[in-house]
Structures are given as structure tokens and as C-alpha cells.
Amino acid sequence: MNILELSEQEIVRRQSLQTLREMGIDPYPAAEFPTNAFSTDIKAEFKDEDEPRQIVIAGRMMGRRVMGKASFAELQDSKGRIQVYIARDEICPDENKDLYNTVFKKLLDIGDFIGVKGFVFRTQTGEISVHAKELCLLSKSLKPLPIVKYKDGVAYDKFDDPELRYRQRYVDLIVNDGVKETFLQRATVLRTLRSVLDNAGYTEVETPTLQSIAGGASARPFITHFNALDQDMYMRIATELYLKRLIVGGFEGVYEIGKNFRNEGMDRNHNPEFTCMELYVQYKDYNWMMAFTEKLLETICIAVNGKPEREIDGNIISFKAPYRRLPILDAIKEKTGFDCNGKTEEEIRAFCKEKGMDVDETMGKGKLIDELFGEFCEGTFLQPTFITDYPVEMSPLTKMHRSKPGLTERFELMVNGKELANAYSELNDPIDQEERFIDQMKLADKGDDEAMIIDQDFLRALQYGMPPTSGIGIGIDRLVMLMTGKTFIQEVLFFPQMKPEKKMPQSAIKEWEEIGVPEDWAYVLRKAGFNLISDIREEKAQGLQQKIGEINKKYKLGYEKPSVDDIQGWINAANA
């Protein structure tokens, strides 16, 4: 990287880096630095009457106040922040005071990692702090952090642009309070979920992410190519069909927590790569699964929040069992006045069009009902509500309802206006399943790119016999959103999918060279604000010479100054 591509602060930091090395200080030491305390523990366990506690801590320097022979630094470790008192003659007991006067005061920067050995004390202002006896550099930072400043209770220079926060999550975690806590709560959600399932006797398993058939859900898959087999493969859209194979194989209950991939849109509730938990238990039905799900979510909410409720968007959402249960067709009738019972595909499509919905001939009856529910019903269910008994056209992997012809034993759990879980009494009739797959292929022939493909191996597994089974899929990212009160899925993903980063248009160095500009001077031109060759077309040669000469002098580059005639040649070539 050319030095002129760096900011002023980055250049200064690299100069400090070089000076440290010249002083014999390794800015990136390899040796272990064992610590024995965290900032939060130091504060919580401090007692004025105790003997001073000897501690070794390490962390990122987030602030510094230099006051002659004594200074204060703010150190941030993985748990929190603590003040460090640094006295020149304490860390430099002999005649050489370079560690304090040069290294600490001049060469260290905000963002550097330091190690401190010393003891705990309380300052005259009452702040629990660490009195440094030894100090060392553990890692030099080369980019300046965006440091939030406060004045009269107002924050300035906040790092709060969502795109920057999501793209540079590592910076977000450093400078914004509460971000790390969200991801620690996510870990609590997963840990509690596993604990409940393990204690119930169910086995965590892993199934293929690369699949030859994208089955188990209605979604558009990502496609890749497996060179060794010269075969197209799919990133899985669900784990369902492989987990059911394991139920066929004799497991009582299996679950998987893993990534699924759907080649669809991105918004505040959807990411193309997402985490899902699927659970399948033999000899159970969807009624049992509703009761199990209620207790599971109540347990998770208590683990995260200390109580079975959470405030989201100003609404108190209660996860305390039991939840309301409402058939989907009743929900549509309740919200629209239209009764889908007994209606044909054409009648439902006509009603959708009457309501101004964007529907077409490729949509079958199930898809139309799904669109109706999404348009008029889904967003209205704030409290946890089981939407049950879906039409068979919407549920190709679900057992027919035991008492309601044309419907299936399926539920979706709605919370805060969004789907959180999807569950069935699983279809285990191999003949019925094959017929459902064939119906799905007919939808695909009509243009539905989310219709399921026939999975012949799954049908073969069913033919060996699968016991009565209930299964559920829970979107972990949405679950974490609910448990942490976040309204954007990007807030609970460390690194959400982003659009390509916008970059300032620049002419390539090679393009500058093609019009006669030497490589070194091409970087100087960029530093002077001429990013495109077209930017110099209206410049006067003498004025341009002065501008780039100032850059040459400021950064002590020592380049031989081009003549006015040389620069005029560049301008002429740019206008050619």
C-alpha cells in the first residue's frame, strides 16, 4: 500500500510503529501475557479495608489524560472498562524514562492493547482504579477508532450509521455500548435451547449443507457446482428431510441447529443466510408440539430476561404459556370477512385481485391463501399465537387433519407480527407423500420457482416406515430478536449480508501511466483530490504543479518535481 493512500492519523501511527521498533520494542510480541483479573471483577470485589490486591490486566486503551509526571488511561477488556493510574517514576524506576515520556505519552494511541501489572486502589474522587507498576505494549493499532465524545449529556461523533456498523461489526463492538451484550444474550438463547432439548433426551445431529435436492421447504435455493462429480448442488434451504431419515433410522428425537440458505430478498426480517433449529420427535403430534414449544420459549425468555416477557417496540410480549390457538382460515375470515372454506383457486384469486393484491396465474390455491394471510393477518398478532390447520395445498409434508377434510395438522407460531416457528404432525404415508410431491411439480411447471422437487431417496426412506412424528422449525435469528427486543435482524447477526461496499470511483494507476503520469505521481494526484483522469482536464499546468508539489513537500516524499511541460502533456493526454 502506498503511504499516500492512508489518512493523516494512519500515517502518524505507522511512523510511531517504526519508532517503537527502532527503540527495540516489539509492537506485536509473541509471548503469552497471563492475566488474573477482569475490570468488572476488580470493581465488584474491591473493599477499602482490604490489603491492596495485586492484579495483572490487559485490554484496549480507550482514553488517556496526560498530566506531567502522572497520567490516567482508560482500559477496556472483554468485560468492561477500568481506569489505570500511571506515574512516570513507578513504571520507569531507573534513570531511563523513555517508557513513560516517549512510549506512553507519544507513541501509544487510542485503540492500542496494553498490559498492566499493579494493584487496586480508590482515587481521591472515589473511582476504583489500577495503580500501574509495570506497563507494556501488546498490540499496536494502525487505524483510529471513532471515539464517541459527550458534552452536557449529548453524544458527538457517534458510530451509529447502520451500514457502517454492520459492515465493520468489529468497530461497532468496540465503541458502542450494548452491542456485545446482544450477542451474549444470543449465546444464552442457544445454550438454553440446547439444554432443554438435551435434558428431554433428544440428540443433536449434523446433516449435509450441500444437497443434491433442495427439499424440506418452499424457497428458492442457492446453486453451486461440484466439480468432482460435475453436478449442480444446492445450499440447503431446510434440514427437514434428512432429520426425518434419522427418525426412520430409529432415533427417538433429533434436532439440528445450523445455517440454511435461501436465495431471496433481504430486509429488516430476512437474511439469505440464517440459523434455524429443527426438532423431530417420534410418537408425538402437533398438539404435543404446541405445548412443548410454549414451555421452551417461556424457559428461554426467563433465561435471557429474568422473566417470561419482553418489551418490543413499546409492547410487552408475554411468552408465558399457554398461547392462543387460531385456525388460519378463521384468521383470514376474522380479518377480511372472506371465507376460504370451499372456495376454488379461481374464487380466491379473484378476491385477492379485488383487494388490490399482486397475484398471478402461477400461484396455486395454497400460495394465494398464504398471500392473503401475509397481507391481512400476520402483522396483527403481537402476542404469541398458534395459527393452525393449514390447507393441504400449503403443506406438502404435513399429515392430513384427523377430523377436518382438506386441512392439515400444521401450525405456525406468530409473535410480534412475524412467523417464528413452523410445525407439523409429519406426513409418514409414502404414497400420499409421493402424490404431494407430484402436485408440487405441477406448480413448478406453472412457473412457481419455490415449489418442492421430488426427493426419491426420502420417499424410499418413508417406505421402510416412519413412526408417527411431530417436527418443528424455529428461526433462531428471529427468536433472538424477540428475546433481545431488536427490530432489525441485522442487529442480532454478527456479519449480516450486505450490498457491495460503495467505493469512490478512481482511475487505475495503470491508466494514469498510460497518459504519461509516473506511478509515484499518480498517487500524489489522488492525494491532491484528482481521483479520475478527467479531473485534471480543466487544470492549468502551473497550478497543478504547485498542488502536487505541496503534497510532495508535506509528506517529505523527495520525488523529482515534474516540469510544467510534463504536466501539460498529462493534461493534453487526459483531453485526447
Where are the language model's segments positioned?
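Class II aminoacyl-tRNA synthetase catalytic cores and aaRS-like
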Residues: 1-504
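Compact, charge-rich alpha-helical regulatory domains located at protein termini
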Residues: 501-576
